[in-house]
Amino acid sequence: MLDGPLFSEGPDSPRELQDEESGSCLWVQKSKLLVIEVKTISCHYSRRAPSRQPMDFQASHWARGFQNRTCGPRPGSPQPPPRRPWASRVLQEATNWRAGPLAEVRAREQEKRKAASQEREAKETERKRRKAGGARRSPPGRPRPEPRNAPRVAQLAGLPAPLRPERLAPVGRAPRPSAQPQSDPGSAWAGPWGGRRPGPPSYEAHLLLRGSAGTAPRRRWDRPPPYVAPPSYEGPHRTLGTKRGPGNSQVPTSSAPAATPARTDGGRTKKRLDPRIYRDVLGAWGLRQGQGLLGGSPGCGAARARPEPGKGVVEKSLGLAAADLNSGSDSHPQAKATGSAGTEIAPAGSATAAPCAPHPAPRSRHHLKGSREGKEGEQIWFPKCWIPSPKKQPPRHSQTLPRPWAPGGTGWRESLGLGEGAGPETLEGWKATRRAHTLPRSSQGLSRGEGVFVIDATCVVIRSQYVPTPRTQQVQLLPSGVTRVVGDSPSQSKPGKEEGEGATVFPSPCQKRLSSSRLLHQPGGGRGGEAEGGRPGDSTLEERTFRILGLPAPEVNLRDAPTQPGSPEHQALGPAASGAQGRAEGSEVAVVQRRAGRGWARTPGPYAGALREAVSRIRRHTAPDSDTDEAEELSVHSGSSDGSDTEAPGASWRNERTLPEVGNSSPEEDGKTAELSDSVGEILDVISQTEEVLFGVRDIRGTQQGNRKRQ
């Protein structure tokens, strides 16, 4: 399609042609496409054309050329054509990895940079002229193009034409490196982005455009495009908006050209995305200096990223990065140029100068240094940037972890330039540049060794503690309701309890809770069971409850309050229903005794379940994944409870418990977790012991029931 030689000639041939023929005759002779291209350059783009941009890039180019002819110049439209070409060109470049002569590309890139500003100015002038001259002089526009081209030619010496042709060329022909477009991109960026483009391109487009436009050297066509990492989580996201603004936009534009030198110096190393991309789209990723990613010099310095990938470069880039920081932040072109020049502005100057967030600045600094040095050793640069340094460069796939610039990160010191012997002073300067708060806390002190600073937040360990196996205690229920961890003798006195006694037992919160849980869960449990249960819990359990569960007596009472209605009389009735429903209290005592055995047999299930539930709740409160305990508890309750009747009370009891317990225990639980584990073990032991004692003392029936329930 395009005449390869013509385009390949680069800025020179188009430039010459433009100069000689004012871009018309010679071009026509050589190629209609070329002619069209010239016209495109000269002619203003109609708004339609930009809309077409997204369409076929090649078609859009050709159509664009024609459109340019057709469409009169628009005030702002001239720039869009380059823009569109950029998009198409960039996209194509992104897809076509062509090997292009690096030297040529670099030369072009430099030309581009120079021409970019000139062309920008020319374009602005042209645009203004057009606006003033008339809405659309598409035909006149052609002559217009001459003047326009002429200034460009004078300024760029073929930059505009070559750029346009090159845009076309990439479309038509992959071989051409993006150098020219990139050079234009600088101008195009300045122009299209600065003035012509109403809005920023999509993220992808921007990456592509910026990468190709801003980074001729970036394209190693023989290699696949570098991995562009997602924004870093580590970087300061606040930097996004900091530098942004007209100034910033301008900076990106200028920086693209200026940055180009760094890139050029660095070789393809530097892919300079529009700084806006770094701040807006990439966010902190723009800051990711160390990676030679597409946008490798994110944020403030174009040079930085690639240099960082190259270890040596990275180290070198520290100083350059400082310069780059300045340039990237304030005036990328100038500062960058300075930095590239080898001015090691970085440590202090860049910190001061860099409008960029502190992070970008330091990184920029590294990179700038790298860029500058990259110039010195371009060959090294490319490979380093493009080829991950075995040591320094973190794997591309894990971009987030080994941030070269991250203090704790693998390449941090290298990035700083420490790796290459950058003195601590450099590091200090760098650190000074960076706000302390931006440094990862752990990394604030430099770690001398290589390594990756990894924060794994996948799981949070609330507490890890050793829980000893519960110690078995013999709990005997005494008629007095006093729990003694003693022999078996008192256990028999339990049956002697009376309803009154059971009521008395209730007063102790633990007893109440225990008895209520027992009663609730066991209609047959009877007051006797309750009283008995209460007694065991009387002193020890009560204490433990307060101490372990952190349940104040009032809370326990609250729990029991609902339970009690069913517990003393109701439960008594329940047991009575079991066999002594209408009996008098005296008779009930007997029932209680009998049931006490049964209740105890049974109680262990609910009682144990209640305790377990409480424990599990506490544990769940601290560790969300211990839900299984509750499920178990529920099953235990249902299994142990005699009837749905019991279950319902159990449920209510459980709920009540939960409310107060969760509320009260959580504060205390946290502090008492260690104690709790022991206490829980103790409680469970007590329960088991109590069950054993009770079972041994109780009826065979009760024992059987207890066994059943425990099973």
UniProtKB/Swiss-Prot annotation:
Example of a GO cellular component annotation carried by this entry: perikaryon
Keywords from the named record: Cell membrane, Cell projection, Coiled coil, Cytoplasm, Endoplasmic reticulum, Membrane, Nucleus, Phosphoprotein, Postsynaptic cell membrane, Synapse
Lineage: Eukaryota, Metazoa, Chordata, Craniata, Vertebrata
Organism of this sequence: Homo sapiens (Human)
Residue ranges, annotated region (Interaction with MAGI2): 186-236
Quaternary structure, from the entry: Forms a ternary complex with MAGI2 and SH3KBP1; recruits DDN to the cytoplasm. Interacts with MAGI1. Interacts with ACTN1 and may interact with WWC1. Interacts with the podocyte slit diaphragm proteins CD2AP, NPHS1 and NPHS2; the interaction with CD2AP and NPHS1 is direct.
Skewed-composition ranges (Basic and acidic residues): 105-127, 529-546
Stated name of the protein: Dendrin
Any one Pfam family match given in the protein's UniProt record, by short name: Dendrin
Region spans: Nuclear localization: 113-131
Keyword Endoplasmic reticulum: yes
